[in-house]
């Protein structure tokens, strides 16, 4: 194995969770500006697409990163060991510091086909994928859930994964069936940590689920002794979730982050075509909590280009500048 960066991280370390159509190079840079985590993951990258003769072009945008994002981990999914073997070698050549396997995605057309969280029902395949992913020499990690249907599945499933000699295990503390509809099962953390200590003490343990910010994560790490904290959906309500010294943020700061997002979208679109259509989903992150935010957000949702959004922001700031705090 090449250098295992996980071992060099502070304790606890903080990770921005991989999120489909969210954690691309553009949004990661916005988060880094607002408050940087210790580790970045890419979006979900389909190993089958990557290994298809024409596939590398289709996933190139998902694998775009810059060196100032290091350490960054390629987050991949699929169910064919040979594809994982090829992809692990390719990710090492691209300069990624680690490879993370998705065993938690609950989306029906993924899980229902035995991929993502569907691998919980295919433990032998899951083990094969992990071993194949080690071919490139990168530290291999896994992101998964407590179980597929029942919470009680966690012990057998996590024991199996911990026996595979992985660098880090990130656990979304819900089952596939629960999606995100129930509270994360924080109450299981002590038992899960005990299991890790017994089965694979060298594997780092990262928890995920209902953790809104660094401060909450620090309390959980102190209480339970886990190694890492992963924040996902919390970033949508607080783009400053990873900041080390929490403080009140002005509306101007939020608008400036949105402008940065627009600028980065345009910049990276020059390298790889990036459709505008997914961009408005991010507006709710920045356009909230200040006078006129709701109306401005509704206007921005109907735009067709970044320049249209900038024009609306310019107009808004001219009208409300004195009220922006």
Curated annotation (Swiss-Prot):
Keywords linked to the UniProt accession: Flavoprotein, FMN, NADP, Oxidoreductase, RNA-binding, tRNA processing, tRNA-binding
Enzyme Commission number(s) from the entry: 1.3.1.-
Xref: PROSITE patterns: UPF0034
InterPro entries: Aldolase_TIM, DUS-like_FMN-bd, DUS_fam, tRNA-dHydroUridine_Synthase_C, tRNA_hU_synthase_CS
Cofactor: FMN
Classification via Gene3D superfamilies: Aldolase class I (3.20.20.70), Putative flavin oxidoreducatase, domain 2 (1.10.1200.80)
Ligand binding (FMN): 18-20, 143, 208-210, 232-233
Keyword set includes RNA-binding: yes
Catalyzed reaction equations: a 5,6-dihydrouridine in tRNA + NAD(+) = a uridine in tRNA + NADH + H(+); a 5,6-dihydrouridine in tRNA + NADP(+) = a uridine in tRNA + NADPH + H(+)
Entry annotated with the keyword NADP: yes
Matches recorded under SUPFAM superfamilies: FMN-linked oxidoreductases
Active site: 105 (proton donor)
Top enzyme category: oxidoreductase
GO MF terms, alphabetically ordered: flavin adenine dinucleotide binding; tRNA binding; tRNA dihydrouridine synthase activity
Similarity field: Belongs to the Dus family.
Function statement: Catalyzes the synthesis of 5,6-dihydrouridine (D), a modified base found in the D-loop of most tRNAs, via the reduction of the C5-C6 double bond in target uridines.
The protein's name: Probable tRNA-dihydrouridine synthase 2
């Amino acid at each position: 194995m090449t250098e295992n960066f996980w071992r060099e991280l502070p304790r606890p370390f903080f990770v921005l969770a991989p999120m489909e159509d969210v954690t691309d190079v553009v949004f990661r840079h916005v988060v880094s500006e607002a408050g940087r985590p210790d580790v970045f993951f890419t979006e979900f990258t389909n190993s089958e697409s990557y290994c298809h003769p024409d596939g590398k072009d289709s996933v190139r945008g998902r694998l775009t990163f810059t060196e100032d994002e290091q350490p960054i981990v390629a987050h991949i999914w699929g169910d064919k060991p040979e594809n994982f073997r090829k992809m692990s070698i390719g990710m090492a050549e691209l300069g990624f510091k680690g490879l993370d396997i998705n065993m938690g995605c609950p989306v029906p057309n993924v899980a229902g086909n035995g991929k993502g969280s569907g691998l919980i029902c295919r433990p032998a395949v899951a083990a094969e994928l992990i071993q194949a992913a080690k071919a490139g020499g990168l530290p291999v990690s896994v992101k998964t859930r407590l179980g597929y249907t029942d919470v009680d599945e966690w012990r057998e499933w996590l024991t199996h994964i911990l026996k595979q000699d992985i660098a880090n295990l990130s656990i979304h503390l819900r089952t596939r069936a629960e999606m995100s509809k129930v509270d994360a099962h924080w109450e299981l953390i002590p038992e899960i940590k005990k299991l890790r200590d017994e089965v694979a003490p060298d594997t780092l343990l990262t928890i995920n689920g209902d953790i809104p910010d660094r401060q909450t994560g620090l309390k959980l790490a102190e209480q339970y002794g886990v190694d890492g904290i992963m924040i996902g959906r919390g970033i949508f309500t607080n783009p400053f979730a990873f900041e080390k010294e929490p403080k009140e943020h002005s509306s101007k700061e939020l608008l400036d982050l949105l402008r940065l997002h627009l600028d980065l979208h345009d910049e990276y679109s020059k390298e790889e075509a990036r459709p505008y259509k997914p961009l408005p989903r991010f507006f709710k992150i920045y356009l909230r909590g200040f006078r006129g935010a709701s109306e401005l957000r509704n206007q921005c949702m109907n735009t067709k280009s970044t320049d249209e959004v900038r024009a609306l922001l310019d107009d808004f700031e001219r009208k409300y500048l004195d009220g922006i705090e």
